Structure formats: C-alpha cells, structure tokens
Amino acid sequence: MSLANQVLAVNDDLPIRTHKPVHSGKVRSVYWLTEEDSARLIKEKGYDVAPDAPLAIMVISDRISAFDCIWHGEGGLKGVPGKGAALNAISNHWFKLFKDNGLADSHILDIPHPFVWIVQKAKPVKIEAICRKYITGSMWRAYANGEREFCGIELPEGLEKDKALPELLMTPSTKGILKGIPGVPEADDVNITRQNIVDNFEAFNFSNAKDIAQYEKLLKEGFNVISSALEAIDQTFVDTKFEFGYVHDAAGNEKLIYMDEVGTPDSSRIWDTKEYQAGNIVENSKEGFRQFLLSHFPDPDILLNKERMPEREALARDNELPVESLMDISRTYIGIAEKITGQPIKLSNDPKAEIIEILSKEYGLID
C-alpha cells in the first residue's frame, strides 16, 4: 500500500445523502443532512439536542495548508499521512477535558470514525479567537518592525522574541471577509480590537453584547486547561486559535459553544519545553512546516506578502515538495497526538472505504 493511498486528500466526494451543496474548506468538508436523516439520527442515537436540530457530517482530510494555500508532495502525495486522524483525536481529547472542567460544550455529537464527526449546525461567531502567551510569529514581526499596538493592546518596550508575554493576550482577527464594519478592512484574517467587536457585535454574529465577555472567558479558560495539561507532558502552549458559535439545546435555549478544532498543531504553536529551556525552539505544530517552506523557496516574501497571493498560489500549485518534508510533519502530528491522548494513532490503508462502510451500515446515510 503506497503512502498516497493512505492519505485522504479529497473529502468532498463521498456518497453521503445530502440535499445541499457540500461545503469544502481548507481541511474539512461538511455534508448537511436532510431533515429526515437528522431527526432519525437524533432519535436513534439519543443525541441531546432538539428533535428538529439540523445535523451535518464533518469529514477531515489529510491535506496540508500553510500561508492560505494547499501543498502537495512528490509521487502523487496529496497530503500528510495520519494528519487528519491526529487532529481529530487531539480535538476530541480537549473537548472532553473542557467538559470535565465544566466549560462549554462543542458542536460534536458523535464520532463514527477517526476522520468523521457528526455535528450540530451552529451559527458561527465571525472571529478567529486568538490567544497568545508568548511573543512570536506575526506579533513578533510587527513588534520587531516598531509597532507597539497590536489588536488595540499597548505592548511595552523590551519584549524579546519567543519569550513569555507579561500576561495572556487575546488578539482577535476576522473570520472571512466582513463588509461594512467601520474601521475593519474588507480582507480575510484582519486583526481587530476588542472595541471593534463591542461597537459592532451583531456584525460579528454575537447574539448580544454580553456574550463578548463570555467568549473571552471561554477562550482564557480553554487556553489554561490545555496549557496545564501540556505542561504535564513537557510541552509549552505558546498560542492558539479557537472558534465559537451558537446552538440550541434540547429545550430550545441558545448557548455559546466551542466549535471547529481546539489545541491542535494546525491551530496552535506547541513547543517542546525541555528544548525551550535549553534555548532551542522545537515545534510540535504546523509552524515547523511553515518554516520549511520559508527556507525551501528562494523568495520567502511570496509566502508572507498578501499582495503576492497569485504568485503564492502558483508556487503551491506548480511545486511538488520532497516526500520527506511531508513525512516530517506526519511524525510531528502523530507524535504530539499520541503524547496528548496517550493512545496510538493508527493509519488506515483506505480511509474513504472505511468511512463509507460505517456511515452506511451504522448510520444509514449512504445512497
């Protein structure tokens, strides 16, 4: 069995019964179930949601995105072996830990397969909820260029690259391109201030202004839960991105929940603590792959400059990366997933066939 066959690269062509177009994101695809199938599964499986709640099947892929592009390797390798299963396993672990610690629920109702979640449809808050404990990445680049205000937060003089910030900082950005919000550029992933959110909470999809404080509370508490757990396995939680949304519970009450993924190598920076204490940065996250790309191509500005997006897209489309570069990230993802969960990540020889069989036999969702 070749490496290419072990990778689930295309995840929006499964024969899952749906009445709407499949939503295909950078890594996950979403299949909206019919009203009949949603109601049937809620009843059959006993999901704790309203009887008429809309459900979806969310299928993760092994694709690797960085700098807003999808990358591929030599020999037809269209993703990273084990990446999808590792990301889902990590998120599942943290969502359970959040619940154990009395934090909010997630949108996940069931996990039929390592690549698959059954989720309740949520109304997403249009914010990338970013939390930073250390100054690195885009924040450091801005600081090194002389900026002393970041997302409306005044930064003191004397901060050093890759060192701890004086306090945990929330530095939100827009989720998608938002139009017509005063002071917010109409571009993807634009840094915003807390005041931007307060002044325009409805435009960011908050149901009411009071929920801004609730999202901040859940962001900080979630960060601290993950940070403490990682500390116990000699890992440092550097920064992360959460997403939030609204669902209705079985009684019809609206509640703010965690959604998408949390605390993964895709959405976070995680450093090896012992190496960090020795003065080295060893990434257990996608940052290692980003750094590889920056050194692999002769003009790294293409990857960093948003005005050169057409060149960047061509770079990703036309260049096959060395297989070893994708296997490096595979080892990183599987390794950190196994450390976090305490369980082995098993690679499937044919994940697509497995998913179809389970969703057919156990859920009756395949035509």
From Swiss-Prot:
UniProt keyword Secreted present: no
Annotated keywords: ATP-binding, Ligase, Nucleotide-binding, Purine biosynthesis
Reaction equations catalysed: 5-amino-1-(5-phospho-D-ribosyl)imidazole-4-carboxylate + L-aspartate + ATP = (2S)-2-[5-amino-1-(5-phospho-beta-D-ribosyl)imidazole-4-carboxamido]succinate + ADP + phosphate + 2 H(+)
Pathway(s) it belongs to: Purine metabolism; IMP biosynthesis via de novo pathway; 5-amino-1-(5-phospho-D-ribosyl)imidazole-4-carboxamide from 5-amino-1-(5-phospho-D-ribosyl)imidazole-4-carboxylate: step 1/2
Major enzyme class: ligase
EC number(s) per entry: 6.3.2.6
PROSITE patterns reported for this sequence: SAICAR_SYNTHETASE_1
GO biological process: 'de novo' IMP biosynthetic process
InterPro entries: SAICAR_synt/ADE2_N, SAICAR_synthase_Vibrio-typ, SAICAR_synthetase_CS
GO molecular function per UniProt: ATP binding; phosphoribosylaminoimidazolesuccinocarboxamide synthase activity
Presence of the UniProt keyword Nucleotide-binding in the record: yes
Top-level taxon of origin: Bacteria
GO cellular component labels: cytoplasm
Record-stated family: Belongs to the SAICAR synthetase family.
NCBIfam families attached to this UniProt entry: PRK13960.1, purC_vibrio
Protein name: Phosphoribosylaminoimidazole-succinocarboxamide synthase
Biological source species: Vibrio campbellii (strain ATCC BAA-1116)
Primary gene name: purC
